[in-house]
């Protein structure tokens, strides 16, 4: 879109690789810090409930409410993750449709003589990033509130515990798989397995 040269592309690819390495390291620390913070929140929740009532809360697997909360908490991260991935796919398709429209309607764009409407593509990306994240954010925020007020602290404790374990495993899986896919794409684009423009390269894109 910027009509920059091949040398600029090589520089930005190198910077992107450095950024991916830095992000991969940072993600590990971020996941660990988030896990410790969530564990501290669960501990604070148990202590606060024990202070507010006479009988201390017991989060036992033999308790039906705790077990149901564990299943709900383990399910929510996968639901939020699926909604987020779907949002990314929808935004990508919207961007593709807009680019195709510009190729059809803007004279000389395909030949390189016309000027694309970059602002429209930016609006699609930012709009999708804001609108499509409303539902995942609402689920993450309101599900503990609804469960806690509707079914009691035992089920809420189970939800927090199940969500903690599920979130850690899902975050590690997504982080490693996403980094592996991105590096595999760059490996192909550097000339391996057919190089850029091959069928394998198109599949990676």
Question: Which residues fall in each region the model found?
Answer:
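Phosphate/diphosphate-binding loops
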Residues: 17-65, 74
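Multi-pass membrane catalytic core of lipid/isoprenoid biosynthesis enzymes
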Residues: 6-34, 38-40, 117-131
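Long, amphipathic alpha-helical stalk/connector segments used for oligomerization, subunit docking
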Residues: 39-45, 49, 76-98, 103-112
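Juxtamembrane inter-helical linkers in multi-pass membrane proteins
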Residues: 1-13, 93-120, 179, 183-199
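Conserved small/polar residues in nucleotide/adenosyl-binding loops
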Residues: 203-205
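Hydrophobic alpha-helical membrane-associated segments
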Residues: 72, 76-87, 165-176
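C-terminal transmembrane helical bundles of large multi-pass transporters
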Residues: 112-164
């Amino acid at each position: 879109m910027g009509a920059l040269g091949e040398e600029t592309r090589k520089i930005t690819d190198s910077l992107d690789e450095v950024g991916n390495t830095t992000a991969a390291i940072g993600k590990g620390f971020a996941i660990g810090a988030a896990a410790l913070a969530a564990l501290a929140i669960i501990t604070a929740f148990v202590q606060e409930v024990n202070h507010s009532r006479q009988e201390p809360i017991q989060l036992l697997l033999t308790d039906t409410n705790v077990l149901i909360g564990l299943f709900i908490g383990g399910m929510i991260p996968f639901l939020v993750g699926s909604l987020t991935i779907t949002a990314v796919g929808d935004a990508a398709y919207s961007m593709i449709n807009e680019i195709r429209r510009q190729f059809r309607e803007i004279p000389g764009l395909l030949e390189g003589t016309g000027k694309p409407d970059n602002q429209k593509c930016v609006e699609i990306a930012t709009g999708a990033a804001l609108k499509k994240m409303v539902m995942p954010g609402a689920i993450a925020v309101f599900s503990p509130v609804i469960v806690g007020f509707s079914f009691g602290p035992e089920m809420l404790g189970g939800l927090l515990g199940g969500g903690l374990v599920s979130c850690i495993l899902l975050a590690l899986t997504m982080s490693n798989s996403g980094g592996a896919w991105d590096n595999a794409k760059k490996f192909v684009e550097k000339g391996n397995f057919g190089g850029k423009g091959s069928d394998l390269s198109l599949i990676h894109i």
